[in-house]
C-alpha cells in the first residue's frame, strides 16, 4: 500500500527550510521543544483572524534570546492601533516562557496572499463555515491562485461534504503538482473547517515553480 510523504518535510534542505532553527544540550532539548509548541499553539489560535501563514522560531545559540518571525496576510490585525496589538502579543507569549527569556517579534507581511497555501486554505475554510457548497468554495480559491499564474494547485476537502451522511474525500486539481520532484517548490497546508455537520479537513498543494540552482 502506497504511503504519502509530507511535501514540506520531504524537501527540507532543498527547497524548504526548518520552521525552528536552534540547537540545545541534551538536558534542555525537551523543554525548548515544549516552549516552541506552546508558542505555536497560542499563535495558531490567532491564525484565522490575523491570516498567519508561517511561524519561524530562531534561538541564538545556547543563550536565552528568541526571535519570532510571523508571516501574515493582515499585519495590521497583529500590530493593532499604535502598536497595542504587538505589545499584547509580546506580553501573552512571555507568560508562556520562563522569565529569563528575551523575546523579539518580527511581523512580516505576505505580499501575494494568493500564492500562499495556508492563506488559500483559510479562504476555503471561511467559505465552508459560511455554508457555501464545497465545490464552489474550492473553485473560487483555485481561481484566485490561478490568476497569479501558479504552475499548479490541488485542493482536497474531506468529511461530511454538503451534510452527507457518509464522510468522503473529494479533490480538484488544475495544472501540474509534481510531488515526487524534489526541485519543485511545493507549498502545502492543512486546515480544519468547523461546520454544523462536523469538522471538514482541507488540504492545499501549491506548485509555484522549479528551483534549479539551490
UniProtKB/Swiss-Prot annotation:
InterPro entries: KH_dom-like_a/b, KH_dom_type_2, KH_sf_prok-type, Ribosomal_S3_C_sf, Ribosomal_uS3_bac-typ, Ribosomal_uS3_C, Ribosomal_uS3_CS
Gene3D superfamilies from the UniProt entry: 3.30.300.20, Ribosomal protein S3, C-terminal domain
Domain KH type-2 residues, every copy: 39-111
Keyword annotations of the record: Chloroplast, Plastid, Ribonucleoprotein, Ribosomal protein, RNA-binding, rRNA-binding
An example molecular function term from Gene Ontology annotations: rRNA binding
Pfam families: KH_2 (PF07650), Ribosomal_S3_C (PF00189)
Top-level taxon of the source organism: Eukaryota
BP-aspect Gene Ontology terms: translation
GO cellular component labels: chloroplast; cytosolic small ribosomal subunit
NCBIfam families: rpsC_bact
Family: Belongs to the universal ribosomal protein uS3 family.
PANTHER family (alphabetical): 30S/40S RIBOSOMAL PROTEIN S3, SMALL RIBOSOMAL SUBUNIT PROTEIN US3C
Quaternary organization: Part of the 30S ribosomal subunit.
Protein name: Small ribosomal subunit protein uS3c
Native source species: Trieres chinensis (Marine centric diatom)
Amino acid at each position: 500500500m502506497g504511503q504519502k510523504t509530507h511535501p514540506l518535510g520531504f524537501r527540507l534542505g532543498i527547497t524548504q527550510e526548518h520552521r525552528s532553527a536552534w540547537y540545545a544540550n541534551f538536558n534542555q532539548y525537551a523543554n525548548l521543544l515544549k516552549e516552541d509548541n506552546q508558542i505555536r499553539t497560542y499563535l495558531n489560535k490567532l491564525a484565522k483572524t490575523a491570516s498567519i501563514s508561517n511561524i519561524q522560531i530562531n534561538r541564538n545559540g545556547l543563550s536565552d534570546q528568541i526571535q519570532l518571525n510571523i508571516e501574515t496576510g493582515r499585519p495590521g490585525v497583529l500590530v493593532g492601533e499604535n502598536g497595542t496589538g504587538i505589545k499584547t502579543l509580546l506580553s501573552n507569549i512571555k507568560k508562556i516562557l520562563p522569565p529569563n527569556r528575551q523575546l523579539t517579534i518580527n511581523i512580516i507581511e505576505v505580499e501575494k496572499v494568493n500564492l500562499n497555501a495556508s492563506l488559500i486554505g483559510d479562504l476555503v475554510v471561511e467559505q465552508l463555515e459560511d455554508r457555501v457548497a464545497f465545490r464552489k468554495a474550492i473553485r473560487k480559491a483555485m481561481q484566485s491562485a490561478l490568476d497569479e499564474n501558479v504552475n499548479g494547485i490541488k485542493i482536497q476537502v474531506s468529511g461530511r461534504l454538503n451534510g452527507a451522511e457518509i464522510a468522503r474525500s473529494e479533490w480538484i486539481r488544475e495544472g501540474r503538482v509534481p510531488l515526487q520532484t524534489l526541485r519543485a517548490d511545493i507549498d502545502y497546508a492543512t486546515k480544519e473547517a468547523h461546520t454544523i455537520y462536523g469538522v471538514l479537513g482541507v488540504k492545499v498543494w501549491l506548485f509555484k515553480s522549479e528551483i534549479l540552482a539551490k
